[in-house]
Amino acid sequence: MALEAATAPRALLAACLVLLVLGGGTGPSSVLRAPGRRPAAVPAAAERLLRCRAYLVPARRTPARTAAALSAVCTSAPAAPWASSTACPAGATSPKPTAPLEAGTWHACCNGWQEGRGIRSVSISQ
């Protein structure tokens, strides 16, 4: 119970980071720069995040083991309670993280195959 309570803020942080990575110029800041416009950019960014399957994976002792853990989570049914209940699609590529895989961090593996972006990884310090 205490472990789930401790990981909830990390999962929320991971979701926010994925939203920032995938949002690009369509995030809340673009809405603030355009006075008088309807805030249509925020729902589009949220929809992008919902289409993306994001998973949190604890880092292992070596980058190779962390990459293997990311690959296992992104290509099979996730075991983490905060992960999506569906596995990545068969056509998903192997994870090619855009951030360094360092020990002592959590990594969010995001499968953006719907938009042809491949899988991204965002490093989250513990």
From Swiss-Prot:
* Top-rank taxon, per record: Eukaryota
The free-text tissue note of the record is: Enhanced expression in male flowers. Accumulates in the tapetum.
Give start-end of the signal peptide.
1-23
What are the protein's UniProt keywords? Answer: Signal
Q: List the protein's name.
A: MFS14 protein
> What organism does the UniProt record list as the source?
Zea mays (Maize)
Lineage of source species: Eukaryota, Viridiplantae, Streptophyta, Embryophyta, Tracheophyta
